[in-house]
């Protein structure tokens, strides 16, 4: 007697059952745990004699493959303690700042709209400055790990498709780089005049939506020694309009001498109505904080959409104060 195989049995034998994909996790009501600190491995400067690179190629796939010397540091959560920090002592400050702008991805809309003016007025109010000149801004909206994976087969000098959070300890301008930037962005006569009184470069960093992953940490300027700062050439193969010059000098930062030397801080769950002011340079040499190393970092509690943020770089001038 010949057995009969039904159509259903044949299909079941030929095509293994595959469960449908799980729906994405609904994180709309999820909250970050209130942890007082994270112990995180940070990427510090690797000495070129030990295999480190002499040049930082900004905006490239190669930057994401750069070799570093890593150190585990403690990053304290200052949510609720924001008022304890200020620009002149620590080099950074958290402020409340509402904006009328809701869309940050359109470069020209930000440049031509009200946002730069709002930032300038806020900086004058917070710092007492007499003049603020906005250099430009940078919008970040890509996840670091996802971008690293997507670009894994691309050559080092390939420009990334967008901006991810920066995951290495640095200061955007060295002392030399700040002066160079001043003369690049302002008319020579005006730059010479403004250099005679106190001036600074301050970045205004703000989330575009609530931060649930890859937060930004800042290091107390007093805890970083001058001999841990290395003037490093920063090159960009293709200039981003107003975001960075093609050639820049920045500080790469050496690892701390002891695990607790560098004092790192962040504020959890920053929202669109909060901003972090980060000092990159100050002409004052009287003990005023002059530069702040910073870096983003992953946490085991990260969730949600990629972190989206905008960083506005500004010259800040006090024409009624001595330069140093």
Swiss-Prot record:
Pathway note: Mycotoxin biosynthesis
Gene: CTB9
Function according to Swiss-Prot or TrEMBL: Hydroxylase/desaturase; part of the gene cluster that mediates the biosynthesis of cercosporin, a light-activated, non-host-selective toxin. The perylenequinone chromophore of cercosporin absorbs light energy to attain an electronically-activated triplet state and produces active oxygen species such as the hydroxyl radical, superoxide, hydrogen peroxide or singlet oxygen upon reaction with oxygen molecules. These reactive oxygen species cause damage to various cellular components including lipids, proteins and nucleic acids.
Protein name (Swiss-Prot/TrEMBL): Hydroxylase/desaturase CTB9
PANTHER family: BLL6449 PROTEIN, OXIDOREDUCTASE AN1597
One GO MF term: oxidoreductase activity
Protein EC: 1.-.-.-
Catalytic class of the enzyme: oxidoreductase
Record flagged with keyword Secreted: no
């Amino acid at each position: 007697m010949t057995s009969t195989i039904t159509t259903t049995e044949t299909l079941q034998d030929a095509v293994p059952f595959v469960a449908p994909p799980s729906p994405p996790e609904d994180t709309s009501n999820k909250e970050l745990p209130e942890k007082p600190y994270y112990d995180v491995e940070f990427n510090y400067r690797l000495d070129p004699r030990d295999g480190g690179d002499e040049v930082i190629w900004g905006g490239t796939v190669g930057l994401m493959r750069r070799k570093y010397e890593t150190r585990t540091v403690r990053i304290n959560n200052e949510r609720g303690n924001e008022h304890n920090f200020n620009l002149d002592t620590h080099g950074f400050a958290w402020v409340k700042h509402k904006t009328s702008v809701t869309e940050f991805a359109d470069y020209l809309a930000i440049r031509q709209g009200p946002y730069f003016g709002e930032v300038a007025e806020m900086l004058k109010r917070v710092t007492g400055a007499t003049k603020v000149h906005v250099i430009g801004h940078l919008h970040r909206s890509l996840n670091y790990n996802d971008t690293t994976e997507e670009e894994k087969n691309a050559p080092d000098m390939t420009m990334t498709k967008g901006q991810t959070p920066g995951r290495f300890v640095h200061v955007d301008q060295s002392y030399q780089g700040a002066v160079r930037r001043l003369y690049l962005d302002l008319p020579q006569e005006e730059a010479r005049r403004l250099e005679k009184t106190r001036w600074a470069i301050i970045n205004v960093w703000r989330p575009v939506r609530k931060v649930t992953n890859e937060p930004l940490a800042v290091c107390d300027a007093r805890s970083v020694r001058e001999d841990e700062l290395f003037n490093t050439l920063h090159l960009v193969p293709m200039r981003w309009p107003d975001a960075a010059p093609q050639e820049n000098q920045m500080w790469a930062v050496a690892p701390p001498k002891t695990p607790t030397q560098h004092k790192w801080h962040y504020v959890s769950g920053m929202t669109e109505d909060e901003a972090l002011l980060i000092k990159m340079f100050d002409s004052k040499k009287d003990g005023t904080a002059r530069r702040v190393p910073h870096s983003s970092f992953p946490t085991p509690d990260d969730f949600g959409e990629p972190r989206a943020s905008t960083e506005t770089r500004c010259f800040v001038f006090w024409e009624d104060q001595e330069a140093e």
